[in-house]
Curated annotation (Swiss-Prot):
Pathway: Amino-acid biosynthesis; L-histidine biosynthesis; L-histidine from 5-phospho-alpha-D-ribose 1-diphosphate: step 7/9. Belongs to the class-II pyridoxal-phosphate-dependent aminotransferase family. Histidinol-phosphate aminotransferase subfamily. Homodimer. GO terms for molecular function: histidinol-phosphate transaminase activity; pyridoxal phosphate binding. The gene is hisC. This is Histidinol-phosphate aminotransferase. Gene3D superfamilies: Aspartate Aminotransferase, domain 1 (3.90.1150.10), Type I PLP-dependent aspartate aminotransferase-like (Major domain) (3.40.640.10).
Length: 351
């Protein structure tokens, strides 16, 4: 066993509704609003596509996910040779880390961001520098100051999970202009389809200028396919060729690929999800306590409080399972009736 693994722990997704009911003696229904899932689910076309291909379960998928790769290349107008798929972004992050990092290498990222950047770097015996957030947002200047000759990867999450904040197009361009061109800057845009800010980065456009700007996207969030595990990286061809060596041969399942194809095709449904989410998100910021919320461009709201466990339990008492952090609670935006219950709790809670 690698010694460095001893300093890590397995991912803990939080207690299930069943376990929470037992622990807290809750009798009524519990709603899972802890994992930033799209509770509306995927497009109806996805279910039709899955049903249409159920007779293929005995076959391995086509290696490399060629159908969805071609569809994404047309949708985003990019060369398919610049795309690599994984079983969710977790696997994509693992493949990149495994392909690039050697013992003693360094990654630079932020504190309080998606934990798999750190986790996979430690597995590869790399050193991790985590720059503190500035009011919930990535400190790009602080990250830049930590980049040196040992730095092999820079991880950015935009919008950031768990805070929901984002950096602008101009901020990202300015950052990329100052990062040495041989160091990959990987921008994780798992929640990009929820973003409505006009100055949100067009990272695809910036890739035309900066070959070291890599982009991660997923079907798990706005597309509603978290259970199907499919995400991808867009990067320079040379990098994709190297990462592809690490990719397991049949990593994305047949049904996952068909589901993603159907979801991508139904952009009208995706737009309706974005609109509903933005409408419900805005209602949280109409509360008088909204100065305790980080501005969000995602399908969740981070509530800052020095009483996170008390707030978590108060929300649990109205049937809403959220995610507790040391300095606050992350609330997934759910259906209107669930959101209304949570806003009522927040309105009465002393943050």
């Amino acid at each position: 066993m690698k010694k460095q693994i001893e300093q890590l722990s397995a991912y803990e997704p939080g207690l299930s509704p069943r376990a929470l009911k037992e622990n807290y003696g809750i009798k009524g229904e519990l709603h899972k609003l802890a994992s930033n899932e799209n509770l509306y689910g995927p497009s109806p076309k996805v279910k039709e596509a899955i049903q249409a291909h159920l007779d293929e379960l005995q076959y391995y998928p086509e290696t490399g996910s060629p159908l969805i790769k071609e569809a994404i290349s047309k949708h985003l107008n990019i060369d398919p040779a610049r795309i690599l798929f994984g079983a969710g972004l977790d696997e994509v992050i693992l493949m990149i880390s495994r392909a690039v990092l050697t013992p003693g290498d360094k990654i630079v990222t932020s504190e309080m961001t998606f934990g798999q950047y750190y986790h996979n770097a430690i597995v590869e015996s790399a050193n991790v520098v985590q720059v503190p957030l500035q009011n919930g947002e990535f400190d790009l200047d602080g990250i830049l100051s930590e980049i040196d000759n040992d730095t092999k990867l820079v991880w950015l999450c935009n919008p950031n999970n768990p805070t929901g904040r984002y950096f602008t197009h101009d901020a990202l361009r300015n950052f990329l202009e100052r990062v040495p061109s041989h160091i990959p800057v990987i921008v994780d845009e798992a929640y990009v389809e929820f973003a409505t800010a006009k100055d949100f980065p067009d990272t695809l456009a910036l890739q035309q200028e900066f070959e070291n700007a890599f982009l991660l996207r997923t079907f798990s969030k706005a597309y509603g396919l978290a259970g199907m595990r499919i995400g991808y990286v867009i990067a320079a061809k040379e990098a994709i060729e190297k990462y592809n060596i690490i990719r397991p041969p049949f990593n994305v399942g047949r049904l996952s690929e068909y589901a993603a194809l159907a979801a991508l095709e139904d952009q009208e449904y995706l737009a309706s999800i974005r609109e509903r989410n933005a409408e419900e998100r805005e209602k949280f910021f109409e509360l008088s306590q909204s100065d305790h919320f980080y501005p969000s461009q995602t399908n969740f709201v981070f509530v800052k409080t020095d009483k996170p466990h008390e707030l978590y339990e108060a929300l649990l008492n109205v049937g809403c399972i959220t995610r507790e952090f040391p300095n606050g609670v992350r609330i997934t935006i759910g259906f209107p009736e669930q959101n209304a219950k949570m806003r009522e709790v927040l309105a009465q809670f002393t943050l």
